[in-house]
């Protein structure tokens, strides 16, 4: 399970990057009217998203056996989810970086910036979809479930909502944006709660209703039950912190801590995901052998 750390780092960082862009950066940069504080906060969120995705892309090369052969990966767009994933990853990275450059050089949501933001949002959404499609394999039934795309989406949504709420709560986005912190805190609470409920009930191999019943060539999933308990504890702690902010507590420190706990829980969950029985993703089977 631990040998899959490059895939764990890639998926968590990439999904968080898309979520931070869609939920934290996009609303601030696309907002009408000149607001230097909101623009600055939006650029910070966008830079964090681009940096996380660039790091995720670099980490993905650690996973492959022959990185130089990765140039072949775009040759199978019609049949391979991996090819589509890489295409949309590169498109999202380029479009998000171009949008950031446009927002920095030309303040205000002009036509060019709006178009770049919309295109980057579409590419990011398709990137997440392609990432989930890689695991839709009949030979890996524990991964080929609705929880896989849902958990990927919840990682993106939770990270993005928590980042957006924190930027507003700490005043980085300006007083006008700070006044709209509440909906993002509520969205954070719902996202973390949904992740916790899914992990407890339907996470393959560990959820209450999806525990393995057939023998496997790999060690039983119960050997990693401690990590699942840690994951649930991290999500419960994050949920408690966000709940405290909803109840009126000051959010700057609590939301930052909740974001860290949520990312840690997502990382633990991804290690459990890759520890399930089944073939490795096609990235290490078809293109780089």
Model segments located where?
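Cytosolic, membrane-interface loops and tails of multi-pass inner-membrane proteins
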Residues: 66-77, 202-221, 276-289
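Long, contiguous internal "core" modules enriched in hydrophobic/ aromatic residues
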Residues: 5, 11-15, 32-37, 78-80, ...
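N-terminal signal-anchor module of multipass membrane proteins
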Residues: 1-52, 275-279, 287
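Membrane helical hairpin/interfacial module
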Residues: 20-27, 39-95
């Amino acid at each position: 399970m631990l040998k899959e750390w490059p895939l764990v780092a890639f998926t968590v960082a990439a999904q968080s990057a898309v979520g931070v862009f869609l939920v934290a950066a996009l609303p601030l940069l696309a907002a009408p009217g000149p607001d230097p504080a909101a623009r600055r906060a939006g650029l910070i969120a966008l830079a964090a998203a681009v940096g996380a995705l660039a790091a995720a892309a670099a980490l993905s090369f650690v996973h492959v056996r022959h990185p130089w052969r990765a140039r072949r990966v775009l040759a199978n767009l019609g049949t391979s989810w991996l090819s589509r994933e890489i295409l949309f990853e590169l498109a999202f990275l380029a479009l998000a970086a171009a949008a950031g450059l446009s927002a920095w050089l030309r303040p205000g949501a002009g036509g060019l910036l709006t178009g770049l933001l919309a295109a980057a949002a579409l590419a990011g959404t398709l990137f997440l979809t392609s990432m989930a499609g890689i695991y839709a394999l009949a030979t890996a039934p524990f991964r080929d479930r609705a929880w896989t795309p849902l958990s990927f989406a919840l990682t993106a949504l939770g990270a993005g909502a928590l980042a957006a709420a924190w930027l507003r709560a700490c005043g980085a986005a300006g007083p006008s944006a700070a006044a709209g912190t509440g909906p993002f805190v509520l969205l954070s609470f719902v996202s973390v709660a949904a992740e916790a409920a899914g992990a407890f009930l339907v996470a393959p191999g560990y959820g209450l209703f999806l525990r393995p019943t057939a023998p496997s060539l790999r060690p039983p999933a119960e050997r990693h039950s401690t990590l699942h308990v840690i994951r649930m504890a991290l999500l419960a702690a994050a949920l408690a912190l966000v709940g405290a902010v909803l109840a009126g507590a000051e959010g700057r420190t609590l939301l930052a801590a909740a974001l860290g706990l949520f990312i840690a829980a997502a990382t633990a969950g991804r290690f459990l995901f890759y520890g399930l029985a089944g073939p490795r993703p096609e990235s290490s089977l078809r293109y780089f052998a």
